[in-house]
């Protein structure tokens, strides 16, 4: 597995400065976000965004497109699919092969919504395929739709779209309703991408994004989860996505250096580095 950093971790630095600081710290794999790219594009171009990556020797491994009603019928779906297509175009131009959207639904969801989910997945997958991208679903612990690994695997398998795969976020997995045993459901090579965090020893009912910490600083069984993912033939990026203000507003070089030291120790212990 390889270490990566998600741009949310250095959000205050902006698109260019976050990447420059990380590259200086030796990071080679990065995950970009729609919000930070949009800020960059206010004064520059998609081609320039790609040059920032290539000039720094960075490989973009995934990109976030946070949109409502991508994976479920809803009032925002038509507009979200238009934005999804634009994001696919932007991210493929930058050099990406993967795009993800989290399940951010917070309204009441019915059994009929779940029945319609595979068709929604196929439609989003068809758009991603036009740009040679793999679309990934990130289940989110607070979602009223896809909040667990089990549910996400079920609907993706039912959709059976070659360009749509599941991803796993350590925080949403361990702090939500999923169980460690659910990892046994994963088929060999099925997981396309991983967000890597540790989680504070806090009651799940009180947990928020501040409960995400650098791997090794929390109480989650991160080593055991890494070993299980390796058993399931995952060998891709471990993208560190954190929201602590001290990190988001910190110097990207120092933040990346700190993350690298701690994460590599955990990865070595798990035997995945």
Task: Describe these PLM feature segments.
Residues 31, 62-64, 100, 136, ...:
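Conserved beta-strand positions in the central sheet of alpha/beta enzyme cores
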Residues 45-56, 120-127, 182, 225-228:
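Catalytic-core regions built around general acid/base machinery
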Residues 21, 25-41, 64-69:
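N-terminal substrate-binding region of glycoside hydrolase catalytic domains
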Residues 1-26, 54-57, 95, 146-168, ...:
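Histidine-acidic metal/acid-base catalytic patches
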């Amino acid at each position: 597995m390889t270490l990566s950093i998600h741009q949310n971790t250095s959000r205050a630095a902006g698109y260019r400065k976050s990447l420059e600081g990380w590259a200086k710290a030796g990071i080679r794999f990065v995950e970009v976000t729609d919000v930070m790219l949009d800020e960059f594009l206010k004064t520059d171009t998609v081609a320039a965004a790609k040059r920032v990556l290539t000039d720094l020797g960075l490989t973009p491994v995934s990109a976030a497109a946070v949109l409502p009603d991508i994976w479920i019928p809803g009032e925002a779906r038509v507009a979200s699919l238009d934005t999804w297509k634009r994001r696919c175009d932007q991210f493929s131009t930058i050099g990406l092969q993967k795009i993800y959207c989290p399940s951010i639904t917070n309204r009441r969801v019915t059994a009929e919504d779940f029945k319609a989910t595979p068709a929604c997945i196929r439609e989003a997958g068809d758009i991603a395929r036009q740009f040679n991208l793999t679309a990934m679903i990130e289940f989110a612990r607070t979602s009223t739709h896809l909040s667990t690994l089990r549910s996400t695997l079920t609907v993706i398998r039912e959709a059976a779209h070659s360009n749509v795969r599941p991803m796993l976020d350590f925080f949403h997995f361990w702090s939500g309703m999923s169980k460690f045993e659910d990892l046994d459901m994963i088929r060999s090579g099925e997981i396309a991408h991983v967000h890597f965090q540790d989680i504070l020893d806090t009651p799940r009912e009180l947990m928020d994004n501040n409960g995400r910490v650098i791997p090794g600083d929390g109480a989650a069984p991160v080593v055991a989860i890494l070993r299980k993912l390796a058993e399931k033939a995952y060998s891709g990026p471990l993208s560190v996505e954190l929201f602590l203000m001290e990190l988001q507003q910190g110097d990207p070089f120092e933040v990346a250096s700190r993350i690298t030291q701690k994460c590599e120790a955990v990865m070595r212990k798990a035997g995945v580095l």
